[in-house]
Amino acid sequence: MTLSISDQNKLDSFWSYCVKNQYFNIGYPESADFDYTILERFMRFSINNCGDWGEYCNYLLNSFDFEKEVMEYFAQLFKIPFEESWGYVTNGGTEGNMFGCYLGREIFPNGTLYYSKDTHYSVAKIVKLLRIKSTLVESQPNGEMDYADLIKKIKRDNEKHPIIFANIGTTVRGAIDNIAIIQQSISELGIERKDYYLHADAALSGMILPFVDNPQPFNFADGIDSIGVSGHKMIGSPIPCGIVVAKKKNVDRISVEIDYISAHDKTISGSRNGHTPLMMWEAIRSHSWEEWRRRIERSLNMAQYAVDRFQSAGIDAWRNKNSITVVFPCPSEAVWKKHCLATSGDIAHLIATAHHLDSSKIDALIDDVIADLKKQAA
């Protein structure tokens, strides 16, 4: 069976559209400069990573060996001994966050999840799906959690086992919650570290902070219990995916033996994409530490360039420390639609992902924003 000429033409038209718009993205955190051509031959196979990559699986076409090496890499990156960790390649950041919240709920079934107003919208869905108690915490103007409000609400709830959802780079403002302050503040309430759970959503910044000179606290050495990072954001992937890493002793609590695949399952989803672990493996094996560092540095420099250009025109643009997200006043609908910007209330942002090898798209956006805001002020 073959496609009709009409259907083939439809695919050809979509191909041309994708080629034309491959590097369009300036408003969302996805890097488009990836090349997984070497993996194209594997697309003829149904590769399924159901279950635990650390065990034998009766489904032979899996990429477990590659997934294991991916997890070794991220355990090292996030400062936890590999043998004390467990995680997997997820379908994206939301699944990683759900996994972290699920672990927290299983450890503290009656605990309350605390997350800030700047937290990704998916967490509200996770709260409903897990049927977990939750409390919304105020945010500071820069997008960081309001730590005083967090403590006030833990005290108000008389919560003895809080489950903390910390943002390591918020979606809109790129803010990083200070997990050192969070832990110190909870300690001052008389709650011991073993009596609460701390998950870190590092969807974008999880591949930035390990490669900068002065990172904010974010990893296991700094006190977290689990962390999620996206694969299609700073790394880049044609298929949305992510990586979640947690403490093995906590994951063992949710392990279930599945007889018909002859394996244990600890994951959220059953069947899992076996191609994305190959992509993440190729990405980490083909980039040295220094190459990642230069890639991140270039993006941070481009973000600062955008801030400087905005500010030189009298526009109140800014970014958080170690963030490639540049926040500025929301322009008119015509401008934000033209440049496919993400907007929230009275602000918009651009994200200086790694495929911006020069400033041309950023300059074009800034020129339009400057002209637009002048027009609005006239």
From Swiss-Prot:
What domain of life does the UniProt record list for this protein's source?
A: Bacteria
Alphabetically sorted, this entry's keywords are: Decarboxylase, Lyase, Pyridoxal phosphate
Query: What is the native source organism of this protein?
Result: Raoultella planticola (Klebsiella planticola)
Source organism phylogeny: Bacteria, Pseudomonadati, Pseudomonadota, Gammaproteobacteria, Enterobacterales
Keyword Cytoplasm attached: no
The first-level EC class reads lyase
User: Which protein is depicted?
Assistant: Histidine decarboxylase
Query: EC number(s) of the enzyme?
Result: 4.1.1.22
Q: Which residues carry this modification: N6-(pyridoxal phosphate)lysine?
A: 233
Q: Its gene? A: hdc
Question: Quick one: effect of changing residue 148 to T?
Answer: In strain: 28-1 and 42-1
Which family, according to UniProt? Belongs to the group II decarboxylase family.
Read off the Pfam families from this record: Pyridoxal_deC (PF00282)
Annotated Gene Ontology MF terms? histidine decarboxylase activity; pyridoxal phosphate binding
